């Protein structure tokens, strides 16, 4: 019986992780869950459904509200009111991540996942990582803290890489091929995207995801983050990772070996498969998701990425080459811009333009003594430097958005 802690349990990946566990209660026990606290009702339902002993909520004042929700839901279902240990505050998920477990699934959105990721690794627990941002911004701080095999990716693309890489030696790899659906605006030119709305950007063609990752997929920022994640996870040079557009989202990624062979992982788009692998790696769980239907004619297509229209991937590659605090600024500026875009304060194209402007400023070498503004390289990277760069990147992006982009 594996004990599992789920961070970000009320989000898309968190709820699907519980779904995977629900039909396998003889194999997995949920030892704790965490959430931001905006959906206390769902959190209470999860606690009751899975008899969860510990829950962490980022919102300081959530404890009483959660206890009331537990009483109401338990009463309506004729159940005894549970009395879990409730941790609250910004460090609650980090405290939970350090508790005894076999697997911690980090499904928190954004840079807030960094401290829980480091706490999980320090505890020696297997990390099923859906929070790519913590690896991207933490960089070598995360990879150096991890034992061999301790991080198991939950992103479908990186799970695909892990599976494909078992088909050859690491020294035999020529390149990684990272697939992208192309998002809702595939095939459109830059000028046609000037007036698209957040509602349009939320209409992903193949995946049902949370707000931030869906907007990131429309700008291709998500693919840029995945590029950085792949380089760090598998110690592959950024220039040996190619991004190709595959609209059907069936081939989740590929590995090309030095003899010319390419191994691909294919399955219908369903996050339950990489989640199940994240919980059970290197073993597979039977019937984790439906397989491909080979009884009907089908077509898989691949096309090059339009970097002129969607410049986020090359921006991410630039940040990755600079390393150190640059990826943290790339991610922070994006998160700030996504908030502004969803609030209607900036246009769609302003997202990547603002990221570029803020990243340029961070890497320019100007004598800016503002905490976090100046680039720190890998050789001097610390957690404080990453957090300062993250905070500066958010503030600076918000300032640029407020007064308009000047490049």
Curated annotation (Swiss-Prot):
The residues the entry assigns to the signal sequence are: none
Instruction: Name the EC number(s).
Output: 1.1.1.267
Provide one Gene Ontology biological process annotation. Answer: isopentenyl diphosphate biosynthetic process, methylerythritol 4-phosphate pathway involved in terpenoid biosynthetic process
Is Metal-binding among this UniProt entry's keywords?
Answer: yes
Q: Which UniProt keywords apply?
A: Isoprene biosynthesis, Manganese, Metal-binding, NADP, Oxidoreductase
| Annotated positions binding NADPH | 10-13, 36, 131, 133, 210
Give the similarity note.
Belongs to the DXR family.
Pathway involvement of the protein, from the record: Isoprenoid biosynthesis; isopentenyl diphosphate biosynthesis via DXP pathway; isopentenyl diphosphate from 1-deoxy-D-xylulose 5-phosphate: step 1/6
GO MF term list: 1-deoxy-D-xylulose-5-phosphate reductoisomerase activity; manganese ion binding; NADPH binding
Instruction: Give the residues the record marks as binding Mn(2+).
Output: 155, 157, 226
Tell me the protein's name: 1-deoxy-D-xylulose 5-phosphate reductoisomerase
Which NCBIfam families does the UniProt entry name for this protein?
Dxr
Q: Which cofactor does it need?
A: Mg(2+); Mn(2+)
Q: What does this protein do?
A: Catalyzes the NADPH-dependent rearrangement and reduction of 1-deoxy-D-xylulose-5-phosphate (DXP) to 2-C-methyl-D-erythritol 4-phosphate (MEP).
InterPro entries hit by this protein: DXP_reductoisomerase, DXP_reductoisomerase_C, DXP_reductoisomerase_N, DXPR_C, DXPR_C_sf, NAD(P)-bd_dom_sf
Broad class of enzyme this protein falls into = oxidoreductase
Q: Which residues bind 1-deoxy-D-xylulose 5-phosphate?
A: 132, 156-157, 181, 204, 217, 222-223, 226
Catalysed reaction(s) here are: 2-C-methyl-D-erythritol 4-phosphate + NADP(+) = 1-deoxy-D-xylulose 5-phosphate + NADPH + H(+)
